[in-house]
Amino acid sequence: MSGFFITATDTEVGKTVVAGAIAGVFRELGYNVGVYKPLQSGHVASNPEGDAARLKSLSGVPTQENEICPYSIEEPLAPRLAMKRAGRVVKLKEITDYYNGLLKEFNSLFVEGAGGLAVPYTEDALVIDFAKELQLPLIVVARPTLGTVNHTVLTIAYAKAHGLTVAGVILSGCKECEMERVKENKEMIEELSGVPVLGLLPFFAGEFTKEEVLESAKEHIMISKLEEFIQNESNVAGAPSM
């Protein structure tokens, strides 16, 4: 399996923007990359304000929103609870089988979870159980400032305890006026976790375009390091899968 599992230290830390931006950059580089967010709460998949729509817009994939996210609920709750309150049952096998189906269309998939790794996800699994099924390297998206060292180091330790590989951390929402503290946090996360911080993505105020986000990702995220993971995972040695 090839791609990344994008998780976070919490909800609303910029996970969808990071996932969509990295996927969009990889597609510009010629990689046949798809995006997948199995479960979404807070918006139905077709809602332009939702994560599935944002993933589609930023990544540039041809996949429709309800194919990117096959299970979505309007109520903003943990996915398992939102599905239960709506009278729906989704099992781990269903979203894993769907992932395998998408791999027939794409060489690599960037999979976005929901919130953090311990979020109740399907009826029978947490987010981390799904990540373990896929065995993709993790990208951990985290806030850049106060509290992030603790949250990020704990997330990495939890992932490693479950046998998962953490490719790196991306601090999202970095403001210029806070960069001294952000860089200190970056150094502490790397020192305490042994995992590299691969990007300090700036804060986007108000509306933003796909072009702005992708250019920012190219400038502030170490895409070449992520490319190494994709190339090492794939059977196409040393070259993008077209």
Curated annotation (Swiss-Prot):
Lineage top rank: taxon: Bacteria
Top-rank EC class of the record's enzyme: ligase
EC identifiers of the protein: 6.3.3.3
Subcellular location: Cytoplasm
Pfam families (alphabetical): AAA_26
One Gene Ontology cellular component annotation held by this UniProt entry: cytosol
Transmembrane segments: none
Pathway, per record: Cofactor biosynthesis; biotin biosynthesis; biotin from 7,8-diaminononanoate: step 1/2
UniProt: substrate binding residues: S41
Record-annotated active site: K37
Presence of keyword Cytoplasm: yes
GO MF terms held by the record: ATP binding; dethiobiotin synthase activity; magnesium ion binding
UniProt subunit comment: Homodimer.
Family designation: Belongs to the dethiobiotin synthetase family.
Function: Catalyzes a mechanistically unusual reaction, the ATP-dependent insertion of CO2 between the N7 and N8 nitrogen atoms of 7,8-diaminopelargonic acid (DAPA, also called 7,8-diammoniononanoate) to form a ureido ring.
Name by which UniProt lists this protein: ATP-dependent dethiobiotin synthetase BioD
